[in-house]
């Protein structure tokens, strides 16, 4: 049975190798705001020419954030004033704007409100729609008119209105697309996270061509905490994979990953505060290892922060070096994709075989410690198998983790027994030269260790582990 378990694991390993050989596309993504700052650092006269240079260096996409209220108003040529600013200004110099003057004369200017001018019904409607995404209690939006002039009042507590989101800047999206680069939207979770708010945000993705990946900003996964299932359904329906930034915990991200069947993109991003303490070589090594060791497939860069750390060349050269290193190791630059399949096709039917192999290994160790007749051996194996089936009935993932942990702990013990103790019940050998005997024992121990590792890898061969959403710490346990 142990031999069958090892053979089953080898079969799954072949399938995994076939999948891994197709999972080699890496996407280098640059933050738009950082790109803007870097273009200024290098003295480019237009963003278009800078983005073209980025593409030549190996960049595939640009991360674009949702438009906040300040940028939205600037784009529309609208000025914003807090109520306390207006009252203080009017105390020194009389405000002449007719609609504001009317409110001031009637004592209707609220210190906590935000006033926008010029106002118009269309803008008021957009702001009212945006307010529905904020908190459970929508922020009141009022249009005040006096003659031909008007002003919009947003009643809010503190900076609530400044948190309004208005989709994506069409100019930014178009500029990126014209350069032949892909847009990766960055989504902020609406404060209310209601279904209507989620739909409103996702509707803005219609402005982004070939959107296949989104990255979440802030401390929460999109749709958290109550509508993650709905969000997952919409993302699957739209063919969009959520990005999971490693080492960054966002509320609800693991649950969302599970709901989309772990069809996620692993992302590595050097946080802004880390750039200043890393050399160019350290950054290059870190980014490459993220891809080669941890299945990261999207590298999120901020070139304006890379630039000061370079002794030679510029950040465009750095990105080109990163691309060269990746391509030299068999990777291909392009849009990132989730792992090809949820799991190898033969995983489900072969997991029980590997589980029985783990049970047989357990019985073998027990027999070494406490020899027993055949009938009790069968009873022990039956009870152990029944325990595995019971746990699997309650939670298949937990059963696989426990089986893997058991194998990871038992295999080193067996390796020691067959190579050092040389107990006849676990290995048979002929007398010979001590060096030859030692070499045989060592080779047998290596075989046992490799076989055990193969079985553990086989049991854990699915996308949840490749994406690092679910992690197995059995190797550490086996060394404690």
Regions found by a protein language model. Name each.
Residues 2-10, 352-480:
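Alpha-helical transmembrane segments of integral membrane proteins
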Residues 3-24:
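Membrane-interface motif at the C-terminal end of an N-terminal transmembrane signal
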Residues 17-346:
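Soluble extramembrane regions of membrane proteins in the secretory/endomembrane system
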């Amino acid at each position: 049975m142990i031999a069958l378990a090892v053979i089953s694991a080898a079969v799954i390993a072949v399938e995994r190798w076939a999948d891994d050989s197709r999972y080699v596309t890496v996407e280098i993504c640059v933050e738009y705001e950082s790109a803007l700052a870097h273009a200024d650092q290098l003295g480019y006269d237009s963003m278009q020419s800078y983005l073209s240079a980025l593409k030549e260096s190996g960049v595939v996409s640009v991360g674009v954030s949702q438009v906040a209220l300040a940028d939205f108003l600037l784009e529309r040529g609208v000025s914003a004033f807090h109520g306390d600013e207006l009252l203080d200004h009017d105390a020194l110099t009389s405000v002449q704007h007719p609609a504001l003057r009317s409110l001031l004369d009637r004592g209707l200017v609220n210190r906590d409100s935000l006033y926008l001018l010029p106002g118009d019904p269309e803008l008021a409607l957009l702001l009212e729609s945006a307010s529905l995404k904020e908190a459970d209690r929508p922020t009141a939006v009022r249009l005040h008119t006096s003659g031909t002039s008007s002003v919009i009042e947003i009643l809010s507590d503190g900076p609530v209105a400044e948190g309004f989101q208005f989709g994506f800047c069409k100019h930014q999206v178009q500029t990126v697309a014209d350069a032949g680069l892909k847009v990766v939207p960055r989504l902020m979770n609406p404060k209310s996270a209601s279904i209507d708010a989620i739909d409103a945000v996702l509707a803005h993705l219609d402005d982004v061509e070939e959107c296949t990946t989104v990255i979440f900003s802030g401390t929460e996964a999109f749709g958290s905490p109550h509508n993650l299932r709905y969000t997952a359904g919409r993302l699957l329906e739209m063919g969009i994979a959520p990005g999971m930034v490693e080492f960054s915990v966002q509320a609800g991200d693991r649950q969302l990953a599970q709901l989309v069947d772990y069809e996620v993109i692993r992302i590595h991003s050097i946080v802004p505060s880390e750039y200043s303490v890393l050399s160019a070589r350290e950054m290059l090594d870190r980014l490459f290892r993220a891809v080669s060791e941890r299945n990261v497939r999207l590298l999120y860069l901020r070139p304006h922060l890379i630039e000061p750390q370079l002794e030679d060349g510029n950040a465009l050269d750095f990105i080109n070096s990163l691309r060269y290193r990746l391509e030299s190791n068999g990777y291909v630059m392009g849009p990132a994709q989730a792992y090809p399949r949820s799991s190898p096709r033969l995983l489900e039917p072969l997991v029980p075989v590997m589980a029985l192999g783990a049970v047989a290994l357990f019985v073998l160790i027990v027999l070494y410690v406490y020899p027993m007749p055949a009938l009790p051996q069968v009873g022990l194996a039956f009870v152990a198998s029944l325990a595995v089936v019971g746990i699997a009935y309650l939670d298949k993932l937990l059963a696989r983790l426990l089986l893997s942990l058991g194998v990871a702990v038992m295999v080193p013990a067996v390796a020691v027994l067959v190579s050092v103790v040389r107990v006849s019940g676990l290995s048979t050998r002929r007398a010979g030269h001590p060096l030859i005997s030692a070499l045989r024992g060592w080779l047998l121990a290596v075989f046992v260790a490799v076989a055990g590792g193969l079985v553990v890898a086989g049991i854990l061969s699915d996308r949840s582990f490749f994406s690092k959403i679910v992690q197995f710490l059995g190797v550490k346990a086996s060394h404690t």
